[in-house]
């Protein structure tokens, strides 16, 4: 893969998953890692998302919309306010919408939404659609 990513031209895209549901976060990470196309990292406590993102340097962030300590929009606002992370695409995932609603282009605070749980193909499709390498023409 010779696409341009934040971490270098030959490195796999990095995806940060922020979700207080450790089972869902782990399954998404394992799925992305096992594809061989991505490097994924999970954060279970959303209050650690900014710190982890600064060190992990993601190319894409997947954030649960509703979490008890901080919700997805709060996490997104922190990431967007950080000069090193500003511009990194953020996608929310939630069980509050259906796959059909997500495909209709619904957005929350300007960010795409992925239904939770999503099928493997839905997850991979959304990742590819939102990685900087794949959206630039």
Task: Report the location of each language-model feature.
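Two-component/phosphorelay signaling modules centered on CheY-like receiver
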Residues: 22-41
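The feature encodes the CheY-like receiver
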Residues: 68-69, 98
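A Lys-centered signature of the CheY-like receiver
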Residues: 116
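Non-catalytic signal-transmission and effector/linker regions of two-component phosphorelay proteins
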Residues: 1-16, 121-137
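Conserved Asp/Asn-Gly motif in the active-site loop of CheY-like receiver
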Residues: 43-47
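Active-site beta3 strand of CheY-like receiver
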Residues: 56-62, 66
């Amino acid at each position: 893969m010779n696409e341009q990513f934040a971490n270098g031209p030959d490195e796999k895209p990095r995806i940060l998953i922020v979700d207080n549901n450790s089972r869902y976060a782990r399954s998404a990470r394992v799925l992305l890692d096992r594809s061989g196309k991505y490097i994924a990292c999970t954060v279970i406590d959303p209050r650690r998302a900014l710190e982890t993102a600064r060190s992990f340097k993601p190319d894409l962030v997947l954030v649960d919309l509703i979490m008890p300590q901080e919700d997805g929009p709060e996490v997104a606002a922190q990431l967007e306010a950080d000069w090193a992370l500003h511009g990194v695409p953020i996608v929310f995932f939630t069980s509050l919408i259906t796959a059909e609603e997500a495909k209709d282009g619904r957005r929350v605070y300007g960010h795409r939404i992925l239904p939770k749980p999503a099928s493997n193909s839905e997850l991979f499709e959304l990742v590819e659609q939102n990685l900087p390498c794949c959206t630039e023409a």
